[in-house]
Amino acid sequence: MIAISPDRLAAIIARREELQAEMARPDLDSNRLVALSREYSEVEPVALAAENVGRLREEGETLEAMTKDDDPELQAMAVEELEANKTALAEAERALALSLLPRDAADERSAILEIRAGTGGDEAALFGGDLLRMYSRYAEEHGWRVEMISASAAELGGYKEVVISITGAGVFARLKFESGVHRVQRVPVTESGGRIHTSAATVAVLPEAEEVDVDIDERDLRIDIFRSSGPGGQSVNTTDSAVRITHIPSGIVVSQQDEKSQHKNKAKAMKVLRARLYERERERLHSERAGQRKSMVGSGDRSERIRTYNFPQGRVTDHRINLTLHRLPEILAGPGLDEVISALIAEDEAERLASLDD
């Protein structure tokens, strides 16, 4: 566990008191007050955690002295309470260390989730549909709102590609480790011989970006308007309402045709474009820091095989943390996914805490 010195604890608490004093000044202008309030909201929980650590350390020192008391009964009581104190202190120091870690600025954001069928043809598309249901139900369990942005349905069911937005507090923090290749092993409905096939789908989770996050020059966009088409290429709309936006500098292309309104299709396409550009910048910054910390959990490489869903064995294995759970139905149903995600978050926290020791 990270050893946090008494001087550092005192400095954290002192900074909170400095902020309180400055915010109480009558001559403080509103812009400065907003900035100080934002810092205070970040410092206050850390200061409370620091005070808790300090209190438990003092309590531990007192109990340690009592274990040497001449009274055997008092000594025995102190030994027992000291064990409880050590456990509480370890938990408090971990909580404080976690609060001191740099936060991912995108954690509290909503997210754009994209699923694309990979190897496996029709079976991969069906699996893409399974993943969509899993994430949609997981979102519902957490009280988040799911909105379909675009979908390319496959003829036998499922999706060749589907994009949804998931809106709520902390969505990205919970789902960001889902990016990567998800593999399924099962007997396809089209398989008459009963042989197990392996198929795959790629998941990408992007933090939702606001207009202020990404500066997009209209002159960098090429916008094409065309007629919507359904499976097999048949026209599904008599008006030119589908929109394709190309961001020329990056080469990113986003198409949207699910809405009957050209205006709504353009708005949805811009939402996805902003998210992709924002994520590209995040990836650039991440790669610059990659030499400082190699993460097994949060690499975010979408070509990395991260998880296998084995139907014959009822097994789900996350390869990044060697986690295997024989609870496939519950996980694909949505609620069971929490156990996997919580394990990934715990591993990421452990890695980041260890990096503070380096």
Curated annotation (Swiss-Prot):
Region annotation Disordered: where it falls in the sequence: 283-306
GO MF annotation: an example: translation release factor activity, codon specific
Alphabetic keyword roster: Cytoplasm, Methylation, Protein biosynthesis
Post-translational modification: Methylated by PrmC. Methylation increases the termination efficiency of RF1.
Modified residue annotations for N5-methylglutamine: Q234
Domain of life of the organism encoding this protein: Bacteria
Any single GO CC term annotated in Swiss-Prot or TrEMBL for this entry: cytoplasm
Pfam families xref list: PCRF, RF-1
Subcellular location: Cytoplasm
Family: Belongs to the prokaryotic/mitochondrial release factor family.
Protein's name in the database: Peptide chain release factor 1
Organism: Zymomonas mobilis subsp. mobilis (strain ATCC 31821 / ZM4 / CP4)
Gene name of the encoded protein: prfA
